Amino acid sequence: MAEKRNIFLVGPMGAGKSTIGRHLAQQLHMEFVDSDTVIEERTGADIAWVFDVEGEEGFRKREEAVLEDLTQEQGIVLATGGGSVKSKENRNRLSARGVVVYLETTIEKQLARTNRDKKRPLLQTDNPREVLESLAGERNPLYEEVADYTVRTDDQSAKVVANQIVKMLEER
């Protein structure tokens, strides 16, 4: 990639956005940024605390402000939060300011990858499968709408997926 364009990774929790994003940034000599980490840094608290105190709506407002800033940078690989695509403004920013890659995965893989993670407020429930299925129904069409590319992450290592994305971008 000759030009320093942004790469935005979207997809559900547990798809591998952060892990794959780090590999991708390293391979492309770009900076890796995780929007959830930036929200935590700016807030001075973790995501679960923000959800507890401000609710999902408060969190989404913070996320929107962070994405407004981050999408204006150049040469970054950005792992977005799973729900960032709920906002039309976020979808528009992502589409206009970089290449969007949807990391697709199954509910089974999401459950396996997130089952011990207590930092996922939406999964702190008796039936995480039901929550993930509901989120998939709501969000998957939005991921598809905004994506320039879609890559399934289920049975491949993060490094292999990152290599696939690099090849797609080179063929672009």
From Swiss-Prot:
Entries under PANTHER family matching the protein: SHIKIMATE KINASE, SHIKIMATE KINASE 1, CHLOROPLASTIC
InterPro entries found in the cross-reference section: P-loop_NTPase, Shikimate/glucono_kinase, Shikimate_kinase/TSH1, Shikimate_kinase_CS
Free-text remark on how the cofactor is bound: Binds 1 Mg(2+) ion per subunit.
Record-given protein name: Shikimate kinase
Subunit structure: Monomer.
Reaction it catalyzes: shikimate + ATP = 3-phosphoshikimate + ADP + H(+)
Superkingdom, natural source: Bacteria
Catalytic EC class: transferase
UniProt binding sites for ATP: 14-19, 120, 156
GO terms, molecular function: ATP binding; magnesium ion binding; shikimate kinase activity
Entry binding sites for Mg(2+): 18
Function: Catalyzes the specific phosphorylation of the 3-hydroxyl group of shikimic acid using ATP as a cosubstrate.
UniProt-annotated location(s): Cytoplasm
Gene name of the record: aroK
Cofactor(s), names only, from the UniProt record: Mg(2+)
Gene Ontology BP terms: amino acid biosynthetic process; aromatic amino acid family biosynthetic process; chorismate biosynthetic process
SUPFAM superfamilies in the cross-refs: P-loop containing nucleoside triphosphate hydrolases
Record-listed E.C. numbers: 2.7.1.71
Pathway where it operates: Metabolic intermediate biosynthesis; chorismate biosynthesis; chorismate from D-erythrose 4-phosphate and phosphoenolpyruvate: step 5/7
Organism: Vibrio campbellii (strain ATCC BAA-1116)
Family to which this protein belongs: Belongs to the shikimate kinase family.
Residues holding substrate: 36, 60, 82, 139
Any Pfam family: SKI
Any single GO CC term annotated in Swiss-Prot or TrEMBL for this entry: cytosol
